[in-house]
């Protein structure tokens, strides 16, 4: 049976000396100081160079990726993970385009968040500054290697990456390409680092590198995220798994219901913003359920339904509590009939990972109740959940979709990779 867990790290990578890992982390800290003092022109030049290097190095990147894909298939990786792992020429070009998009974003550094003049004449301003060193732990997602590095550089941060064994060869080439681009424009190559060659030891040290790494972002399976949150001494921004819901309300338009459900489930089922559970109001079910499920079945979706769903659409297989909690990352879908918007909200509150939920409705009052009651990072009305994405939100790319409430929530772009500090300008004032 295909596995949803990336293959174990390549064992030869475990023999690298621990002091080399420390040098990597310390070099990243040094590079972060240099980046914080760099200009937006310098950082944008670096991003231009990276985009160009990705294009010119596409053949090398795709060749390395082919080796990772072959190893992944031999290891029995699931289709969803293999899809995320894949970098063909088109996807490499898209990565370069994403870097160019990030380069075109406004510089977040030095932005004044708020300010005032005190009665004693002191001038206060709160301004955006880099975190310093951003760590990332992720699996089978080579696009994340480029996205996070580019966002970190744009926001003046160094980055230390742990991309997992499944993409080991691809990530090594991507990091080498980006480091070469940095050197060509006069920035420190150490601003982009990887600890992949250290295997699990690298991940463990990265999680405990408080003082050298300022913030850690995990992206991947629920198990990976739980492990990082539980074991890290570095502050973590949690990017949760995507048990994503679409709710078809009593007044849902039938055509819109089909279009949104199909897009949310089928367009790319292996990503975190894909719909995993469909909730249907009992009054809407006779109008919309069969049409929606027929359209999904015709596109290869297996429906896991409750008794009410199976009574109206016998092709469904029985759903259990495991289905309501499942992030399938495949062409599987859990479907339940509910009695009201309140029942839908209650189901979401119990089973959601607080990523993205959407309601399809023609009733503005019901839409507002749903928006107010659902506690997720992104809540939508009459739109596919697939729009929860940094590029779709205009961020160029994303570090991840934060499902926590502290610091950042939702798609994380360049501003979410900054902190703030207070600048106080005086003319000799003393408190006395």
Swiss-Prot record:
Gene Ontology cellular-component annotations: cytoplasm
Matching InterPro entries: Ald_DH/histidinol_DH (IPR016161), Ald_DH_C (IPR016163), Ald_DH_N (IPR016162), Aldehyde_DH_dom (IPR015590), G-glutamylP_reductase_CS (IPR020593), Glu-5-SA_DH (IPR012134), GPR_dom (IPR000965)
Q: Does the keyword Cytoplasm apply?
A: yes
Q: Which domain of life is it from?
A: Bacteria
The entry sums up its family as follows: Belongs to the gamma-glutamyl phosphate reductase family.
The function of this protein is: Catalyzes the NADPH-dependent reduction of L-glutamate 5-phosphate into L-glutamate 5-semialdehyde and phosphate. The product spontaneously undergoes cyclization to form 1-pyrroline-5-carboxylate.
Pathway in which the depicted protein is active: Amino-acid biosynthesis; L-proline biosynthesis; L-glutamate 5-semialdehyde from L-glutamate: step 2/2
Tell me the keywords, alphabetical order: Amino-acid biosynthesis, Cytoplasm, NADP, Oxidoreductase, Proline biosynthesis
Q: What class of enzyme is it?
A: oxidoreductase
Q: What is this protein called?
A: Gamma-glutamyl phosphate reductase
The GO terms this record gives for MF are: glutamate-5-semialdehyde dehydrogenase activity; NADP binding
Give the UniProt subcellular location, in the record's own words.
Cytoplasm
Q: Which SUPFAM superfamilies does the UniProt entry name for this protein?
A: ALDH-like
The protein's organism comes out as: Clavibacter michiganensis subsp. michiganensis (strain NCPPB 382)
**Catalysed transformations (reactions):** L-glutamate 5-semialdehyde + phosphate + NADP(+) = L-glutamyl 5-phosphate + NADPH + H(+)
Q: Which Gene3D superfamilies match?
A: Aldehyde Dehydrogenase, Chain A, domain 1, Aldehyde Dehydrogenase, Chain A, domain 2
Q: What is its EC number?
A: 1.2.1.41
Q: One Pfam family this chain carries?
A: Aldedh
Alphabetical GO biological process terms:
L-proline biosynthetic process
